[in-house]
């Protein structure tokens, strides 16, 4: 089970957090299969208030392999339902070797900015991202998927893909004016 102590922080030296992660080949090794399970398990437990408190976990909607110091193109994403009558997640999968094959010109950003399990401090500012994306990735069985995502799930997946490329969310914040976003940016969240 992954705990907060296992998650690499952005101020730690000698980690793979800022490296471009290696592509994953199939079939997955036993270690890679376990990593995929562990990443998703962290998200599931962290989104359960009682269990998160029991294990001292910060809630998350995404966790990438480089965040646990493993340089592999793998991330778990679990965007919970926003429908009180249906608790089916909006998006839930372990995305392996993900590639954004198309993206909207329209940008989107969270009104409260973004956070990250690898960043312990609050960093104010808008993180402009593409509002809609088409994502191509492989699952743990090696099956290829192509999905269209918009708004929050698109932002979450772009955040996780950034981790696979050695990029952190605050790299996207305008350094001179943190609360400036491209004209026409859609805000939500």
UniProtKB/Swiss-Prot annotation:
Judging by the UniProt lineage, the source's domain of life is: Bacteria
Active site per database record: 160
**Is Iron a UniProt keyword of this protein?**
yes
Q: Which reaction does it catalyse?
A: N-terminal N-formyl-L-methionyl-[peptide] + H2O = N-terminal L-methionyl-[peptide] + formate
Annotated EC: 3.5.1.88
Cofactor detail note: Binds 1 Fe(2+) ion.
Gene Ontology molecular function: any one? peptide deformylase activity
Q: What are the UniProt keywords, alphabetically?
A: Hydrolase, Iron, Metal-binding, Protein biosynthesis
The cofactor(s) it depends on are: Fe(2+)
Indicate which residues the UniProt annotation says bind Fe cation: 116, 159, 163
Give one Pfam hit by family name.
Pep_deformylase
Q: What class of enzyme is it?
A: hydrolase
Q: What NCBIfam families does this protein's entry cite?
A: pept_deformyl (TIGR00079)
Q: What does this protein do?
A: Removes the formyl group from the N-terminal Met of newly synthesized proteins. Requires at least a dipeptide for an efficient rate of reaction. N-terminal L-methionine is a prerequisite for activity but the enzyme has broad specificity at other positions.
Task: Say which family it is in.
Answer: Belongs to the polypeptide deformylase family.
Name assigned to this protein: Peptide deformylase
What is the primary gene name for this protein?
A: def
